[in-house]
Amino acid sequence: MSEELPQIEIVQEGDNTTFAKPGDTVTIHYDGKLTNGKEFDSSRKRGKPFTCTVGVGQVIKGWDISLTNNYGKGGANLPKISKGTKAILTIPPNLAYGPRGIPPIIGPNETLVFEVELLGVNGQ
């Protein structure tokens, strides 16, 4: 049985030239919500973008896949995220925190919804 892939809805196209690949450092703004709309985290509300290395397990697998456009065979038609892209990522539990969740904030097998904006790749 193959894993579900993230769902990606592009809200605003990026530059379509600057794409992150595994091992790159990305800077993003995000708002994380449960499917019921309850917000559990927000870099925007903290007033500071989030920086991480993608594709190396530093963040949830759904982010690693989405932010590096590394969807495998099943994701050939999924939208690509480039610098400047604003998107809504719907991350299934198998690509988020799975059956363990992060009690009491994120329950077991929760689907997560992130509004993300890719601000930069490797400082660009």
From Swiss-Prot:
Catalysed reaction equations from the record: [protein]-peptidylproline (omega=180) = [protein]-peptidylproline (omega=0)
GO biological process, alphabetically ordered: chromatin organization; negative regulation of homoserine biosynthetic process; nonfunctional rRNA decay; regulation of chaperone-mediated protein folding; transcription by RNA polymerase II
GO molecular function: DNA-binding transcription activator activity, RNA polymerase II-specific; macrolide binding; peptidyl-prolyl cis-trans isomerase activity; protein folding chaperone
Name this protein carries in UniProt: FK506-binding protein 1
Activity: how regulated: Inhibited by rapamycin.
PANTHER family listed in its UniProt record: FK506-BINDING PROTEIN 59-RELATED, PEPTIDYL-PROLYL CIS-TRANS ISOMERASE
First and last residue of the signal peptide: none
Localization of this protein: Cytoplasm
InterPro entries: FKBP-type_PPIase, PPIase_dom_sf, PPIase_FKBP_dom
Principal location: cytoplasm
Protein keywords: Cytoplasm, Isomerase, Rotamase
GO cellular component: cytoplasm; extracellular region; fungal biofilm matrix
Source organism of the structure: Candida albicans (strain SC5314 / ATCC MYA-2876) (Yeast)
EC id: 5.2.1.8
Family of this protein: Belongs to the FKBP-type PPIase family. FKBP1 subfamily.
Underlying gene: RBP1
